[in-house]
Amino acid sequence: MIVQRVEKHLIKQNNSYYPMFCDFAHKSKNLYNHANFLVRNEFIKNDKWLRYGEMDKILKADLEFDDYKQMPTAQSAQQILRLLEKDWKSFFAAIKDWNNHKDKYLGRPKLPKYKSKDGKHILILTNQNVKIKDGILCFPKTFKGFTLNPQFLNKDNFVSFQQVRFVPGYKSFTVELVYNIEVPDALLPDNGRYLSVDIGLDNLATVVNNVGDKPIVINGKGLKSINKYYNKQISHYREVAKRMNNKDYTNRMNSLTLKRNHKIDDYMHKASKYLIDYALENDFNTIVIGNNKNWKQESSMSKRVNQSFVGIPHMRFIEMVQYKAQNAGLNVILTEESYTSGTSFLDNEEPIKTNYDKSRRVQRGLFVSNNGIKINADVNGAYQIMRKVFPKVNADGIQGVALHPIRVSVA
């Protein structure tokens, strides 16, 4: 099976090619707005949808406003028009849904907006324009010698290169290299060996199993430390910027944000890789993960704890586990985790409301069973997450290994 993956490179403001990318992104914005004007005008005046083919024909022939010809390649211009068409498709789909379900909306969906006059827009080049030569991505002559050294060519399962996306950020560009790899057509068979993962803060991932092996905990304190430092610094510099220059965002704040995001992304990659490697090395073909959709709306935590929690992208970690698992043929099952923290695995309780009693979760992260047996609270939660998917899993052989899980650090 062929799947798509993305490799990212960062172009900062001090890069010699940065002004060139700014110019291209500005021209991309101009073309988007020009085409959007044509589509909006046709829709408002004649109630007709000007499609991609018509847009392309009109803009190619426009000699007065040559936004189309200002683009670095004809294919890059066409990609912008396709993005605009996609935006209009989304608009018409929203209108259709609004007509049937007005209660879901605050008002009628609005027409696709123009990009800011001084703004930038994404630039896309296809494999028609960007070629691989001797392991290097070579760009058209209009890119003045710009090249990239992609890492995806070193992958054993690499199939083909698709496109490059230049995504503008705050005084930076993210270069996204889109490529295809081959992954197993079928998942590895269910061998009856399961891992279950409870995601949290101090313990980023508490990982248990159904075969009596000692649980492991992937340390999350490194992530908390990164986030705590970032929040403290940003708060300070925001206050200074507002007081001194009446600004909401500065270059220093942008630099801090980029570094923080890079560190967290790196940590998440290492943690997800550790989990997948652990599953493969120990012959676990299925991974169950508790997914709490209301993480970001958590209101019962203190402000300090909540600040750390909402700043850590737990869903990003899950997505990394999912695509790495897909590469290896492992099965990942997401399940909601309600009532798992206050019901007892050792007492074979179902994780349902009638069994929920949070008072059994005592200090220092321990959970006490009805018989007085102590178990690590996150380990108990992880086992109850497994029970939501595999109700017949039991506590045989678990008591002796569940009190003190093995803590591992990935940074």
Language-model features, listed with the residues they occupy:
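Gly/serine-rich nucleotide phosphate-binding loop at the start of the catalytic core
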Residues: M1-Q79
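A generic secondary-structure signal for well-formed alpha-helical elements
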Residues: Y32-V39, F43, W88-I95, N203, ...
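Generic detection of short hydrophobic beta-strand segments and adjacent strand-loop junctions
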Residues: V6-K12, G145-Q151, I216-I218
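Short amphipathic alpha-helical coiled-coil/interface segments
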Residues: A25-S28, L81-W88, M253-N261
